[in-house]
Amino acid sequence: MTARFVARAVLIDLDGTLVDSLPDLACAANSMRADLGLPLLPVDQIASYVGKGVDVLVHRALTETMEGQAPPAAFQRGKQSFNRHYSQVNGNQSRVYPGVHQALEDLRGKAIALACVTNKPRSFTLQLLERMDLKMAFTAIVSGDDTEQKKPHGEPMLHACQLLGVAAPDATVIGDSENDVLAARAAGCQVIVVETGYNEGKSLANLGADAIVPTLLHAARLIEPRPH
């Protein structure tokens, strides 16, 4: 596969890109609904709710709509319940996608700095990365509560670049969703989308990514180090 990207750093999304975390997210969301006396939802439906952080996932899972806002009291009860359940199951059924460890090893072997950039809260991010044996691959980790704005805003990507000491145009983002593409564009980074993830149930074809590839390993093979 011919290299198409030259970078000093690669910024990688977590859920849907590195790890299939849907089983545990769905378990926690349905446990939350059960606590509030609501019927369980199909996993595929919950999959469409993933990608914009815990608060949005809770609102969507409570209202069963993409743009819904649960009443404040219900939201607070729901979020507390979700966090409690997710802290107990985070990583239990989640799985690292095939080729991810090799992709990270290949990128590090090219002396490309790596950051994980996710909308997931930091406590859950570190818990999952550690359980999946991925944490040590990353020089920097930017979670959903580390910056004022989350993806699709560009701030998390810019913060990751700052932590790695690289300019945004020298970084390539790899993610699975529109959030990642919009955040990359806002920050001034190139972006590759992988087909392993969720993207709120929408097609990847019209996102405007620089490339769409099957897996993280395919993405890693497109990237070569930028000479210093």
Model-based region annotation:
Residues 39, 110, 134-139, 167, ...:
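Conserved H-loop
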Residues 5-7, 87-116, 122-126, 154:
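Short, acidic loop-to-helix structural element flanking the phosphoryl-transfer center
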